[in-house]
């Protein structure tokens, strides 16, 4: 049983270029920047997309973040082949093929091209800045 006291709040991304990264979400996916501030010596940008907040922050003094492994295809799945968060996903309420064509024209890369998922709906993965992978799934 799901605990109704919990509500999803945000995904937190550490970025080498937080302002460029935030702008990518705005230009490629139509996100909006809700807040741009500095906390603990690093920029923090709150990006809103699909009812979710993506908090993108820069390097804090003394931090040396390790790079994320790129997502890669295997026989019948894809993975970053590392422990931890692999990707996050959005349901797209529209023609996913047309959206993929638009994103491709803007230069977005697709580590996993458009295909039918296990549930029969179309899906793909796009490469976002900072080694982040985003799954886009067509609504059922």
Model-derived features with residue positions:
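Core segments of cupin and vicinal oxygen chelate
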Residues: 13-63
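Vicinal oxygen chelate
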Residues: 1-4, 90, 100-140
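N-terminal beta-strand motif that seeds the catalytic metal site of vicinal oxygen chelate
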Residues: 1-20, 85-88, 140
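Short secondary-structure boundary/capping segments
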Residues: 3, 45-46, 77-80
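Short, conserved charged micro-motifs
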Residues: 20-22, 95-99
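Residue-level marker for the onset of beta-strands and adjacent loop->beta junctions
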Residues: 9, 42-43, 86, 122
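Short, flexible, mixed-charge acidic loops at enzyme active sites
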Residues: 60-77
